[in-house]
Amino acid sequence: MAWTSVNWPRRAAVAFLAASVLGNVALALALHDSFVKLQFSRIFPLGHANESRPAATPAGPGRSMTFWGDSRSAMWDKEDLQTKWRIFDEAHGGTTSSQLRLLLLTLPPNRTDVSVVQIGINDLHPLGALGAHKAELLKQLRLNIVAIRDALLERSDLVVFTTIFPPGPVPLLRRAAWDPLTLQYVREFNEVVRDATDGRRVLLLDAHTILSGADSLLQREYADLDFFLHVNRQGYAALNAALMQVLERQPLPSK
């Protein structure tokens, strides 16, 4: 007992030192990760390195469809669509509306029959951490939605603009950077998306209505367990069915 009492302060000091070292290592790794992300965004303002991605299906006869936007568009389950469409993918994870607008200004035009776009959540989900710039960010998103529509009309016969997917319940670690008005902003900007469509060349796919529950959050059956902003295959199956219905109501012009 006496030996334990004598050595307890030493053991506590060793434990504290070990915890301090581990904490500093974790902090250093986090700072390095933040530095890498900051420099990457400065060097690659589109949010991704330049790359050449082939069509998801081989070139050949049939109508073509290009997906644009953020990770929700990049992760869209395109397998079922490939039986009838030649699919191209220009969507990238983390893309904001400003980055998509810049991409459309800089990417050489590759005309396709249909463009499908999902954009907006990456402008809205960081608002809690960017309160000083909120008004400007919201103004810019409104302008970008219209500019993206116009740019896509230059590249395709039809544009399918999807409303912003609802988020799932916000994880605890995300709540400090989550604006409590985010769900309201999602609804408001979905009205902007609706106003940007015309029922002729710009069609609406109301993804939010399909995926959301009564609380305006992503329905549990459609939630991706890995990330609260993502949708699972069941959700994309529902979206694909709706996409086909939208295109059936407004057929492409004959060639």
Regions found by a protein language model. Give the residues of each.
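N-terminal secretory targeting modules
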Residues: 1-66, 78, 110, 248-255
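Flexible, glycine- and charge-enriched loops at secondary-structure boundaries
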Residues: 14-17, 90-94, 131-138, 179-186, ...
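Conserved SGNH/GDSL esterase-like catalytic core that processes O-acyl groups on lipids
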Residues: 38-147, 151
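Catalytic metal-binding/acid-base residues of hydrolase active sites
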Residues: 72, 120-122, 165, 208-211
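Conserved beta-strand segments of alpha/beta enzyme cores
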Residues: 86-88, 158, 201-203
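Active-site segments of SGNH/GDSL-like serine hydrolases
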Residues: 118-124, 150-186
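Alpha-helical scaffolding segments of alpha/beta enzyme cores, especially the outer helices
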Residues: 143, 147-150, 154, 188-195
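Catalytic His-Asp segment of secreted/periplasmic serine-dependent ester chemistry enzymes
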Residues: 166-255
